[in-house]
Amino acid sequence: DALPELVLLGAERNIDTFDVRFNAQGPVNLVASTLSFSDKSVVTRQSRVRDLTLVGEVPPLAGDEDVGTERLRPGAGEGVELQHRVDREARRRSRAFTATGSVRLGCYAGVLRPFRRVTVKLGTTPTSGSYLVERVVHRLTRSDYAQEFTLVTDAVSETAAGSGLIPAGLF
């Protein structure tokens, strides 16, 4: 069961507030190394942004030349298989946009739940598209039901990306 769309503009508006922030330090390609005790060799694993499955349509950065490479700090998460650790951290850091906001009282028919995908319509802006619900707070009073949310995405909308609305090198 898909969540209803969140809409900022027009007659179908159901978003009260919506604030999008761009994470300029992510996404990054990640590299991690560890010592293999069996043969005393160095094992290195990497995860590239271009290999990740996107939440939305188009990656916010054009290619590998726009993405930096970072080495993970040794020791963090050592109990986890190295490739899994690198992939997990790359996925976490790939969230280029974080949005916070709230739905209009009585206007949104759905119940937002974490880890669900929702489509957000913000006109023709590049930040329209698919988001993942990261966090939601439900407030129920005698007269109102309110939802405040945090959404994340690692992509921009295809229509905005192809329209020239995104200045080159900005996203």
Language-model segments: residues:
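An acidic/polar, Gly/Ser/Thr-rich interaction patch typically located in mid-to-C-terminal regions
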Residues: 14-171
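Charged- and aromatic-enriched interaction segments used to assemble
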Residues: 1-12, 19-21
